């Protein structure tokens, strides 16, 4: 009997960056058109990666401040985090290191992080950018820079609407959870003892 390993994957990030859309796009190959703020939700699916079947538990969390005390309850037992920001929102990009990294490092310090830039289809959409003058595009190099700054394992950009790279986000997360990176060891300080 082949027992599949359970992997808990938790999505975090500001409200309205597309976390729920990314999960729905991945699990049902559809794109929801109505925005409904998430309080908490989860999905489960059996997935085959590199010939191994895993039971992937997807935990969707609310990014709104109203849920700051409730959200960390979903972090317990996480194998990997998908930390999402919108590629058309400078505020969500900045909150990755201002809000989300401190929260994740406090509640789940050793869990690997996949940094995800969402809404890739809108980054170069001239009509959208014209209609939304407050939208500021985040470049791939800025995402890579942020990945290094926060110590994420990898960075990937996706579009839930077009499904570009959505499967890749979850494939990478599963592979990281199955073979998490070894934590960097702090150098051991040698203490010496001197007798006088």
Curated annotation (Swiss-Prot):
Protein location: Cytoplasm; Membrane
Bilayer disposition of the protein: Peripheral membrane protein
Motif stretch (Effector region): 35-43
Propeptide: 194-196
SUPFAM superfamilies to which the protein is assigned, alphabetical: P-loop containing nucleoside triphosphate hydrolases
A GO molecular function held by the record: GTPase activity
Pfam families: Ras
Lipid-acceptor residues (S-geranylgeranyl cysteine): 193
Domain of life: Eukaryota
Cysteine methyl ester PTM positions: 193
Chief location: cytoplasm
Purpose: Inactive GDP-bound Rho GTPases reside in the cytosol, are found in a complex with Rho GDP-dissociation inhibitors (Rho GDIs), and are released from the GDI protein in order to translocate to membranes upon activation.
Name used for this protein in its record: Rac-like GTP-binding protein RAC9
Species in which this protein is naturally found: Gossypium hirsutum
Gene of this entry: RAC9
């Amino acid at each position: 009997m082949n027992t599949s390993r359970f992997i808990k994957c938790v999505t975090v990030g500001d409200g309205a960056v597309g976390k729920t859309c990314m999960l729905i796009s991945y699990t049902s190959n559809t794109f929801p058109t109505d925005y409904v703020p998430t309080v908490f939700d989860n999905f489960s699916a059996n997935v085959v990666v590199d010939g191994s079947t895993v039971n992937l538990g997807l935990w969707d969390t609310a990014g709104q401040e109203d849920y700051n005390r409730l959200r960390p309850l979903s972090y317990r037992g996480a194998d990997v985090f998908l930390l999402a920001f919108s590629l058309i929102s400078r505020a969500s990009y900045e909150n990755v290191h201002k809000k989300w990294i401190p929260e994740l490092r406090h509640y789940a310090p050793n869990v690997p992080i996949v940094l995800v830039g969402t809404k890739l289809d809108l980054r170069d959409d001239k009509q959208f950018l014209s209609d939304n003058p407050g939208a500021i595009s985040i470049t791939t190099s800025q995402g890579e820079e942020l990945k290094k700054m926060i110590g994420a394992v990898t960075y990937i950009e996706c579009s839930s609407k077009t499904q570009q790279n959505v499967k890749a986000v979850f494939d990478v997360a599963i592979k990281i959870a199955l073979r998490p990176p070894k934590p960097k060891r702090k150098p051991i300080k040698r203490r010496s003892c001197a007798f006088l």
